[in-house]
């Protein structure tokens, strides 16, 4: 049995899965530890990959934040990982250490492909899909007819820097009122400081459902900003499905209900809006099958000359966690 490995690099962990020819996740590992700078990105990825028995591995895929050139294997502007405008040769570093072919992709785009593949393997075949990650930042990945949309400059899906409120604060990108400034995890924490640290979105939307007038106002404003972005995605790409992931999505059904209520409000006054985006098209990412590492593994498989799509799905294997040195 041969398999590919997919790795998802985050600011505090690297999660890896091994996927066989059928699409089954045969094993998975997570390496915990703060990741800061290109050297630590490489070290964390290698630690996760070396957790597997590599005798049957044929290729490796890595999803990483920032601007990714999948042709050269280089990463820039992965700010949360300490990688700036100078290109970092991530793929070459991993290839040199392990002697396997390596492909890299933006983490949210890899997650979009992973989500699309998971649906395909259970017989759900969306023609197009968008994955929207809402956490420290906001970004999207789009899959059209089974293929990732990257864009001319590798910036497709950077919706965090769509201006949605020109009266809001200045963004680090230089614009005022970007979506990321008003609706990301840190933005919600600033708008609702009553919530516990790291869990402001859950506290906010729960308070709004509970009838707190101040929470209702803040939650409504944030849901409005996010619905504007989702509507833009639906209009631009005519997506069958929009899946929300990231830390803010941990707020769960109360958060999703607020988004769907906004979509319903638009549909009530416009037949075009009702056709463009329906509430049931927007869902939250599944927790039991992380799409990021799966998508990276799929990209690794697609890079092989003999690649063919798997036709069945078996339940994921166990999760193991180790601590980074």
Residue ranges and their predicted role:
Residues 8, 61-65, 105, 130-137, ...:
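Short beta-strand segments
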Residues 13, 108-110, 135-139:
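Conserved A3 ("GATE") glycine/threonine-rich loop of ANL adenylate-forming enzymes
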Residues 29-31, 79, 152:
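Short hydrophobic alpha-helix segments
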Residues 33-34, 83, 156-158:
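A short acidic/small-residue loop/turn micro-motif
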Residues 74-86:
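A charged helix-plus-loop insertion that forms the helical arch/lid used to bind
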Residues 101-115, 130:
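ATP-dependent carbohydrate kinase catalytic cores
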Residues 126-182:
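Glycine-rich phosphate-binding loop of actin/hexokinase-like ATP-binding domains
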């Amino acid at each position: 049995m041969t398999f590919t490995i997919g790795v998802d690099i985050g600011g505090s962990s690297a999660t890896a899965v091994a996927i066989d020819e059928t699409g089954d996740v045969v094993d998975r590992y997570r390496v915990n530890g703060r990741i800061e700078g290109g050297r630590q990105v490489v070290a964390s990825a290698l630690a996760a990959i070396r957790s597997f028995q590599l005798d049957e591995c044929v290729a490796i895929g890595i999803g990483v934040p920032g601007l990714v050139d999948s042709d050269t294997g280089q990463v820039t502007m992965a700010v949360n990982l300490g990688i700036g405008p100078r290109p970092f040769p991530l793929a070459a570093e991993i290839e040199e250490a392990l002697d396997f072919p390596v492909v890299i992709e933006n983490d949210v785009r890899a997650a979009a492909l992973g989500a699309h593949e998971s649906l395909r393997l259970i017989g759900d075949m969306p023609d197009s899909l968008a994955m929207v990650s809402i956490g420290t930042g906001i970004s999207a990945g789009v899959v059209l007819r089974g293929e990732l949309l990257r864009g001319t400059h590798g910036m497709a899906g950077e919706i965090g820097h769509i201006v949605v409120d020109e009266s809001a604060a200045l963004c680090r990108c230089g614009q005022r009122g970007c979506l990321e400034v008003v609706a990301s995890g840190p933005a919600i924490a600033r708008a609702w400081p009553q919530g516990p640290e790291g869990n402001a979105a859950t506290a906010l939307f729960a308070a709004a459902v509970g009838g707190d007038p101040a929470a209702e106002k803040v939650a409504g404003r944030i849901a409005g900003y996010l619905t504007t972005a989702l509507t833009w995605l639906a209009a631009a790409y005519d997506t069958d499905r929009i899946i929300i992931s990231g830390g803010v999505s941990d707020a769960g059904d109360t958060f999703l209900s607020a988004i769907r209520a906004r979509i319903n409000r638009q549909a009530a006054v416009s037949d075009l809006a009702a056709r463009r985006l329906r509430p049931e098209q927007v869902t939250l990412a599944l927790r039991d099958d992380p799409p990021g590492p799966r998508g990276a593994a799929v990209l690794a498989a697609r890079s092989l000359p003999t690649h063919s799509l798997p036709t069945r799905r078996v339940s994921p294997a166990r999760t193991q966690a180790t601590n980074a040195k």
